[in-house]
């Protein structure tokens, strides 16, 4: 049976991978993002050019416009069965660099934006539905210089655990996927910053990063999509409040 799905940050990277997997399973998918062009490109690459899917430009940090976009999806689809809160940003932010504005931007997007997305979707989400939050392995441990990012991703796991209890009476499950290094533009930008900060080549920085990954490679966005799709399946109906590390073995707890 086709599911009605909402995916934020669906225009690139992990979000695009999630969209491909869900659409490939026969689901109707609505993708949201700040820029319309990447969203349309993602849909155009789907089987049938995403004829049963839709794209809407929306910023998860802007509650009113986000709620309007989600309501449009809910009305068009006649409700929602799946909400995937994937939109997020990365980059460095330590105690002193680059300052409180960057902290606010990262936490506002990653943590607040996820909460705003779920709040906007709940009136349209059917009982027995699924919520999947994309956190990170940096939600499981800390990294110096990435204070805001780590804090926001840790916060998402706490949000998942609390919401899982709040929404259990409706039969709605809430889980998180915590990716490690995934082959995306965001990950490449992170490795470039790592190379610059350690004064080594990009190739060397990439090699050092992947040395901490037992399988020795970056994951593909569609692999993360497969984890999300499973959490939305009947087989995962008994799982809620969990954070699954999908990271090639970099984290084993």
Residue map of PLM features:
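Conserved glycine-rich cofactor-binding loop
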Residues: 11-13
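Residue(s) in the substrate-gating loop at a strand-loop-helix junction
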Residues: 136
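Short C-terminal tail/terminal secondary-structure segment
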Residues: 141, 217, 228-229, 240-253
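Active-site helix of classical SDR
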Residues: 118, 152, 160
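Short, small/polar-rich loop/turn modules that mediate ligand/substrate recognition or access, typified
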Residues: 84, 168, 173, 239-241
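Substrate-binding pocket helix/loop in short-chain dehydrogenase/reductase
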Residues: 94-107, 209
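Alpha-helical segment proximal to the catalytic Tyr-Lys
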Residues: 123, 165-166
């Amino acid at each position: 049976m086709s599911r009605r799905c909402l995916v934020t940050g669906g225009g690139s990277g992990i979000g695009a991978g999630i969209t491909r997997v869900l659409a490939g399973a026969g689901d109707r998918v609505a993708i949201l993002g700040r820029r319309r062009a990447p969203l349309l490109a993602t849909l155009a690459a789907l089987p049938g050019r995403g004829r049963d899917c839709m794209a809407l430009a929306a910023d998860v940090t802007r509650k009113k416009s986000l709620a309007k976009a989600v309501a449009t999806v809910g009305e068009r689809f006649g409700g929602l069965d799946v909400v995937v809160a994937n939109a997020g940003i990365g980059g460095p932010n330590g105690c002193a660099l680059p300052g409180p504005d960057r902290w606010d931007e990262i936490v506002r997007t990653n943590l607040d934006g996820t909460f705003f997305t779920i709040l906007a979707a709940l009136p349209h989400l059917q009982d027995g539905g699924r919520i999947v939050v994309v956190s990170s392995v940096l939600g499981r441990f800390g990294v110096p210089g990435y204070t805001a990012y780590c804090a926001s991703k840790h916060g998402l796991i706490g949000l998942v655990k609390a919401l899982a209890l709040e929404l259990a009476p409706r039969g709605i499950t809430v889980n998180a996927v915590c990716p490690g290094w995934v082959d995306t533009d965001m990950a490449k930008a992170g490795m470039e910053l790592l190379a610059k900060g350690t004064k080594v080549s990009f190739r060397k920085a990439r090699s050092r990063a992947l040395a901490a990954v037992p399988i020795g490679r970056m994951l593909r966005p569609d692999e993360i999509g497969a984890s999300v799709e499973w959490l939305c399946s009947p087989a995962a109906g008994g799982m809620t409040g969990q954070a699954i590390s999908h990271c090639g073995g970099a984290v084993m707890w």
